[in-house]
A protein has these predicted regions:
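Hydrophobic alpha-helical transmembrane segments
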Residues: 1-176, 180, 188-318
Length: 318
C-alpha cells in the first residue's frame, strides 16, 4: 500500500501536468448532468415551500449516497486486480478528478493576460465564465478583483477541501465532497426556484467547507510569509475581516489574500442589474491591478504544496 499522502501528491502532480480534461465524460460533468436530471424530476413545481425543501433534501441525500457508493464500488473492484497497487492508482485518478488547481490558475492567468494586453472587453467576457455577477460595466480593477476573489475562494473547494477529505476518508469521501460542492454550484441559489429546493445542498456545502476553509486561511498566511508578501497583515486581516463575508467560509480564503497583497476585496457588485454591497476584506493600500491575480495564484499553489507537505509529515507519525 502506498501512503495516502503520496497518492495525494501524485494526483496534484497529475493535475499540474495535465490539467482538468475538458470532456463531457469528465466525472464531474457526468455528475452535473445527473444532478440536473434529478432537479427536473424531483422539483415540485406547484408544491409548498416545505415540500420544495423536503424534495431538495431527498435529492441531496440521493446524490451524496450514490456518489460515495460509486467511488467505494470502484475501489473495491480495483482491490480485486492482480496488482497490489491497483487500488492506489484508482484512488489517485479519482482524487485527480476532484481537484482543479491548474484550471483555477488558468482562469486567472487568462484574465491577467487580457488585462495586460488592454483587451478589457475580452477580460470581462472571461470574468463572466467564472462569476455570477454582471460584467458588462467592469473596469480593469473590478475585473481583476473578480478574478482574485474567485481564485482565493475556490482554493477551498477546488483544492484544499478535496485533499482534506481524501486525507480523512480516502477517495470516496473526496468524491462525496465534490458531489456536495457541485450540487451547491447548481442548486445553491437564493432565487424563486432554489431558495427552498436548494437549501439543503447549500447547507451541506457550508458544513463540509467549514474546517477546510479555516485551514486554507492559515495556509494562505503561511504562504504569504514564504513568498515574501505581508504575512503579518494577512493574519491581521484574516482575524479582522473574515467573519464579514456573506458566506460562512469565503472570508477565510479572501481576507488573508487581501491582507497579504495589501489590497481591498469585496465592495459593490451587480447581479441582474441590481446593486449589491459586500463587506470589504482588507485595506486599499494599493489599487487592485492585474499583477495581483498572479500573486493570488502563487498563494494558491504555495498553500496547496504546504498542505501536501503537512499531510505527509503528519502521516509519518500517525
Amino acid at each position: 500500500m502506498i501512503p495516502s499522502s503520496l497518492i495525494a501528491m501524485a494526483a496534484f502532480f497529475l493535475d499540474t501536468v495535465l490539467g482538468d480534461p475538458q470532456s463531457r465524460w469528465h466525472p464531474v460533468a457526468v455528475l452535473g448532468r445527473f444532478i440536473g436530471r434529478l432537479d427536473r424530476l424531483l422539483y415540485p413545481t406547484n408544491g409548498s415551500n416545505q415540500r420544495k425543501f423536503a424534495m431538495g433534501a431527498l435529492l441531496t441525500l440521493l446524490v451524496l449516497c450514490i456518489s460515495y457508493a460509486f467511488a467505494e464500488g470502484v475501489l473495491l473492484t480495483a482491490h480485486q486486480l492482480p496488482v497490489t497497487w491497483g487500488a492506489d492508482l484508482v484512488s489517485m485518478i479519482l482524487l485527480y478528478f476532484c481537484i482543479s488547481p491548474r484550471t483555477l490558475a488558468k482562469a486567472g492567468q487568462d484574465i491577467y493576460a487580457l488585462l495586460v494586453k488592454g483587451d478589457l472587453a475580452a477580460a470581462r467576457e472571461h470574468v463572466g465564465y467564472i462569476v455570477g455577477r454582471d460584467t458588462a460595466q467592469l473596469d480593469e480593477a473590478d475585473a481583476a478583483r473578480a478574478a482574485i476573489e474567485t481564485v482565493a475562494e475556490n482554493t477551498v473547494d477546488g483544492v484544499i477541501a478535496p485533499l482534506f477529505f481524501f486525507a480523512f476518508g480516502g477517495a470516496p469521501l473526496a468524491v462525496l465532497y465534490r458531489a456536495a460542492n457541485t450540487m451547491d454550484s447548481m442548486l445553491g441559489y437564493k432565487n424563486e426556484r432554489y431558495l427552498y429546493f436548494g437549501r439543503m445542498a447549500a447547507r451541506v456545502d457550508d458544513v463540509l467547507n467549514f474546517v477546510p476553509a479555516r485551514i486554507t486561511g492559515g495556509l494562505f498566511v503561511m504562504a504569504a510569509f514564504l513568498l515574501g508578501y505581508d504575512g503579518r497583515n494577512a493574519l491581521n486581516i484574516l482575524v479582522r475581516d473574515a467573519a464579514g463575508h456573506p458566506s460562512p467560509n469565503g472570508g477565510h480564503a479572501e481576507a488573508p489574500v487581501a491582507g497579504a497583497l495589501h489590497i481591498r476585496l469585496g465592495g459593490v457588485n451587480y447581479y441582474f442589474g441590481e446593486r449589491h454591497f459586500r463587506a470589504y476584506m482588507g485595506d486599499a493600500h494599493m489599487e487592485i491591478s492585474a499583477k495581483h491575480i498572479l500573486g493570488t495564484i502563487r498563494l494558491m499553489y504555495t498553500a496547496t504544496v504546504l498542505f501536501l507537505l503537512l499531510y505527509y509529515l503528519f502521516s509519518l507519525y500517525y
